[in-house]
């Protein structure tokens, strides 16, 4: 940028169409967060009406994880072939229809299927909205685009909690799901009123349709075995998260089977760049493993170990959720200032200073605990707002929506594993110590994976002929693309 351009406030670099594109995607992501937490809010009411066991009730939450990876793949491929806008609109309609179906569900099976549909739509919304906004904004503002967008999810969760308190006591739990019709109306408005992403339009102007991840996996020479592996992965995930398996060896075996299938899909779809894709799945997996024990078990910790009443628990959780939302926006500024990877590492290192005090001070001072949680979540959880920008930079425009959607939502299975890990450790330690230990140790794994740019580094080690040296989104160099000690001149920009 020129000196005169740098003196212009960042928000003036955006035209009306770009702001409209962001606003539409942000609202879509807010609705995604809204729909995601509805089942958790009314789970006890649903369990009581349908006569479900605790395991069956919990499986309604896990159902979304079972289908997310496939939704990311399918709707991401739609975004790569037909445009980000259509994929985003389709995702919103899909999770809205699933939410509406939950309201009409006569029993467990119907609601479980509806939750599978919601999971697919959620996954597609993440990949399509993120790529849509990032590719619509100027390159030097794309960390802000990513961070601001992801903040919508936290806002949606807060809105859902408020709507729950107003609707359910008066009209019952089904009325909360009937609100799912509203996003469909919003999606129809989007279809007519927002432009296509600039990067996608430029890449596809006058060119033949690209070969998407769906084409490679389900229309290629290995389509039969890939279809069988898809059903095998879905069945394995169902048994792991909803089948009430008690044998740890069987669960581990099914998890290993899923890992082999997902890596196989990545190898087939990414070609020589499969090491990058596999490492990105690991980055996301550990990102969920360090953050989700606190997300899932913090309410339990506050109620059981600190003996807080429900009102106090709600207040503390507000600090936590609001901190994460603010952190997404702060992360966007940090990313554009320091660079995506450096901002991620610095923010996580700062969060490490706070994680031990959060669980060490006890519950004597609610305000101090709330403030500590606010800043810890702002730095540790909020920085994940620029994760779509980080992942998307490793993929060309032709494969970005499916690549981002698939890698993120496979890694997101860590969100289902994390509470289990926390609970297992809590059998030997108190819950607060378990959460602090798990988060503190696994955060360092993410710091190393991102700080050392392991996706590029492993790519260079295994398949150097397909190495990308520069970020495909903002053209900044990848530190792991050259051996340690090499000068800046070693960077040779690859063709995107």
Swiss-Prot record:
Membrane topology according to the record: Multi-pass membrane protein
SUPFAM superfamilies hit by this protein: MFS general substrate transporter (SSF103473)
Its job: Catalyzes the proton-dependent transport of sialic acid.
Reaction(s) the record says it catalyses: N-acetylneuraminate(in) + H(+)(in) = N-acetylneuraminate(out) + H(+)(out)
One Pfam family hit: MFS_1
Coiled coil: none
InterPro entries given in the database record: MFS, MFS_dom, MFS_trans_sf, SA_transporter
Species assigned in the record: Salmonella typhimurium (strain LT2 / SGSC1412 / ATCC 700720)
Higher taxonomy: Bacteria, Pseudomonadati, Pseudomonadota, Gammaproteobacteria, Enterobacterales
HAMAP family (alphabetical): MFS_NanT
Protein name: Sialic acid transporter NanT
The keyword Transmembrane appears for this protein: yes
Cross-referenced NCBIfam families: 2A0112, PRK03893.1
Family: Belongs to the major facilitator superfamily. Sialate:H(+) symporter (SHS) (TC 2.A.1.12) family.
């Amino acid at each position: 940028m020129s000196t005169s351009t740098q003196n212009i406030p960042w928000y003036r670099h955006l035209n009306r169409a770009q702001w409209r594109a962001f606003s539409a995607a942000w609202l879509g992501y807010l609705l995604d967060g809204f729909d995601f937490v509805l089942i958790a809010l009314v789970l006890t009411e649903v369990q009581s009406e349908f006569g479900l066991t605790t395991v069956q009730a919990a499986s309604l939450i896990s159902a979304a994880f079972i289908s997310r990876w496939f939704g990311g793949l399918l709707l991401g491929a739609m975004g790569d072939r037909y445009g980000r806008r259509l994929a985003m609109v389709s995702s919103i309609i899909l999770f809205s229809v699933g939410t509406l179906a939950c309201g009409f569900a006569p029993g467990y099976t119907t609601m479980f299927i509806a939750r599978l549909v919601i999971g697919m739509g959620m996954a597609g919304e993440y990949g399509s909205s993120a790529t849509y906004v990032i590719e619509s904004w100027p390159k030097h503002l794309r960390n802000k685009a990513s961070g601001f967008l992801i903040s919508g999810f936290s806002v949606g969760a807060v809105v859902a909690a408020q709507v729950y308190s107003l609707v359910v006591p008066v009209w019952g739990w089904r009325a909360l799901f009937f609100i799912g019709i509203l996003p469909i109306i919003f999606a129809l408005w989007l279809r007519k009123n927002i432009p296509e992403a600039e990067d996608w339009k430029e890449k596809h102007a006058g060119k033949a349709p690209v070969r998407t991840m769906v084409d490679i996996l389900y229309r290629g020479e290995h389509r039969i075995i890939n279809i069988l592996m898809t059903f095998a992965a879905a069945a394995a995930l169902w048994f792991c998260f909803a089948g009430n398996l008690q044998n740890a060896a069987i669960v581990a075996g099914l998890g290993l089977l899923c890992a082999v299938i997902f890596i196989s899909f990545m190898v087939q779809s990414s070609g020589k760049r499969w090491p990058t894709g596999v490492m990105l799945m690991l980055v996301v997996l550990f990102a969920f493993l360090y953050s989700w024990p606190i997300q899932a078990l913090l309410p339990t910790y506050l109620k059981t170990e600190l003996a807080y009443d429900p009102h106090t628990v709600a207040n503390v959780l507000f600090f936590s959720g609001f901190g994460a939302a603010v952190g997404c926006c702060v992360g966007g500024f940090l990313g554009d200032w320091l660079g995506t990877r450096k901002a991620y590492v610095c923010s996580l290192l700062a969060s490490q200073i706070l994680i031990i005090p959060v669980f060490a001070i006890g519950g004597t001072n609610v305000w101090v605990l709330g403030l500590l949680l606010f800043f810890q979540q702002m730095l540790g959880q909020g920085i994940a707002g620029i994760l779509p920008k980080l992942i998307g930079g490793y993929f060309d425009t032709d494969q970005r929506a499916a690549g981002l959607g698939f890698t993120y939502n496979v890694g997101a299975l860590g969100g289902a594993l994390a509470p289990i890990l926390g609970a297992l450790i809590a059998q030997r330690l108190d819950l607060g110590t378990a959460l602090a230990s798990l988060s503190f140790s696994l955060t360092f794994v993410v710091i190393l994976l991102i700080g050392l740019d392991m996706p590029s580094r492993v790519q260079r080690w295994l398949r150097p002929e397909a190495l990308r040296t520069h970020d495909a989104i903002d053209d900044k160099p990848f530190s792991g693309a050259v051996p340690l000690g090499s000068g800046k001149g070693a960077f040779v920009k690859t063709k995107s």
